[in-house]
Amino acid sequence: MEIPYITPAKLLSTNVLPLNGVKTAFVCFCPMPSVFSKYRLNVEVNTRLFLHVHNMHIMFGQYGATKFIVITEVYGGPVGVTIVEELKHYGIDKIIGIGFVGSFDPAIKTGSIVDAEKSLIEHGTTPHYLSADTKYTFPTLKIELPQLNVNKVCIWTTNALYREFKSDIIEAKNKQCSVVNMDTSHLYAACELLNVSCRYFAVVSDMLDLDGAENWSNDLTDAINHNDSDISVSMSSLIDHIIRQLN
């Protein structure tokens, strides 16, 4: 079997995580959610840990006996799967993806929490991590959040943020999708191949009504600028509930 020419072991051979016993990672396809600050550990990082993410976008935290690393500002499939490969190199065996999605289902409104029960694949990053021709990728980590109102969804993983046309959305809806992002199928595919358990949750940041007069309602701008909104409240609640499941 062929092996890749470039590997995390080659690029990061002298690097180790500065905290022992870390097996869980939050990979955030968004800016650092403020709720993580209350779990932060004072850990000094002296070397760059990830090829595509600066150390200013990572932190270490702890809840009870569980230590974890948080990596933020991870955008798009290629960067996402690179982070997964590097986390595997560091001994991480559990990844929780966090991010935003856009909804085109009127029943799933801005501020709603979604659990990626599966994710529709587009041609691009994902197929490099699959051994079979399939339309969907699936989570391998079981996390239930019964205290929250969580929508089980199929996420359309698109490759081009500024190229979401009406015909594409109709096709995605016909394939069982109700929300869209650029991350989930790549994350699931990379984790499955590398034997890392994973589940992705997100908060709806914007909505598209194909039949409405104003087609797109946008709260994403506020969300990425950390402005107070229903989105930030939902994100804080979501992360708090996930962290309480870690022990």
Swiss-Prot record:
Pfam families: PNP_UDP_1 (PF01048)
A molecular function (GO) term: catalytic activity
GO biological process, one term: nucleoside metabolic process
Disulfide bond residue pairs: none
Coiled-coil segments on the chain, per record: none
Superkingdom field: Viruses
Protein name in the entry: Uncharacterized protein R802
Organism: Acanthamoeba polyphaga mimivirus (APMV)
